[in-house]
């Protein structure tokens, strides 16, 4: 008996919607990364993108434990000399709440072309509305 290897053209991808209200950031991101990779499926193949599409709503209501709301820092560089910037979790939620979940999930995905393809299947929205109703996403309770 030969080992099953999934082919990119035969992979069936479903659409799911996840409500991030009150969910802990790290625990939510771990499950999202697992499902984006396709590790929850029996036909998972490491070198093939077998994951599903995931829509995250209410990203502005995601929670963190402890004092991370004020102590956790996000860094980025503008590209100019001395252009290192930083913001706390609270400031990031106020400025761009989608980025908090995107950064957490992106760090848990493989680095390289396959990881970037997996990341493109993640759609994050700050509010309760999303523009993917035509895909008829199923509610995923994490």
UniProtKB/Swiss-Prot annotation:
The protein's role, per its UniProt record: This protein is one of the early assembly proteins of the 50S ribosomal subunit, although it is not seen to bind rRNA by itself. It is important during the early stages of 50S assembly.
GO terms, molecular function: mRNA binding; structural constituent of ribosome
NCBIfam families: rplM_bact
InterPro entries: Ribosomal_uL13 (IPR005822), Ribosomal_uL13_bac-type (IPR005823), Ribosomal_uL13_CS (IPR023563), Ribosomal_uL13_sf (IPR036899)
Disulfide bonds: none
UniProt-recorded name of the protein: Large ribosomal subunit protein uL13
Sequence similarity: Belongs to the universal ribosomal protein uL13 family.
Example GO BP: translation
PANTHER family: LARGE RIBOSOMAL SUBUNIT PROTEIN UL13M (PTHR11545:SF2), RIBOSOMAL PROTEIN L13 (PTHR11545)
């Amino acid at each position: 008996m030969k080992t099953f290897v999934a082919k990119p053209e035969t992979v069936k991808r479903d659409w799911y919607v996840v409500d991030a209200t009150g969910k802990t950031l790290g625990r939510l991101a771990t499950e999202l990364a697992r499902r984006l990779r396709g590790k929850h499926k029996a036909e998972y193949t490491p070198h093939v993108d077998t994951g599903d599409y995931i829509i995250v709503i209410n990203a502005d209501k995601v929670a963190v434990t402890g004092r991370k709301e004020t102590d956790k820092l996000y860094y980025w560089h503008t590209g100019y000399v001395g252009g290192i910037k930083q913001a706390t979790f609270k400031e990031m939620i106020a400025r761009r709440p989608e980025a908090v979940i995107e950064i957490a999930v992106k760090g848990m995905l493989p680095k390289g072309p396959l990881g970037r393809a997996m990341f493109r299947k993640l759609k994050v929205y700050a509010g309760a509305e999303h523009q993917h109703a035509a895909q008829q996403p199923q509610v995923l309770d994490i």
